[in-house]
C-alpha cells in the first residue's frame, strides 16, 4: 500500500490525514485508516447523532458551549451524514470544517480535501459539533495521555475568545454512564 502523508497540518491545532483507498467497486468504498499517525489507540468511540444534533448541547444560558480534553487526542472519521466541526485553540484561534465520508470542506464551503480523511485535533483543543439534517455517524480513535480521567474528560466549557479565557460550566461525568468511583 502507498505511504500516506499528512495532507494539511497546523501543529498543536489540527491535522487532515487521508484514508488509504484499498478498493473501489460498484457501490463499495473500502479504505484503510493509516495507523502510522496514531501512536496507539486507547478507545474507539462510536458516535451516532440524530438529525441536527448539537454536541455539546446547551448548558443553562450558554447555547453553544465547547468540549476540551486535557489528556486525549481525537481522530475523527465520519462514516455517514455530515458533521460541522469547530475547533479553537488559544494560540491558533478558531477554524471550522464540514466533514463527510467523501470530503472535508472549510467552514466557508471551500473544498479542502476531496476524498475520505480523518480530522485530528490534539489535547487542549476546544471543539464542538453540529450534525447535518440527515444526522451522522462517526468513529473517533482516542489516544489517552497520563492524567486522563473519564470523570473530567468530557467537561464542558464556555469560552471568551476575545479575552482568551475559558471556564467550566458542566462536569462531564454528569452526562455519562460511569461506574461509581472506587473508595
Spans of features found by a protein language model:
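Active-site region of the double-stranded beta-helix
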Residues: 1-113, 133-183
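Histidine-centered metal-chelating micro-motifs
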Residues: 116-129
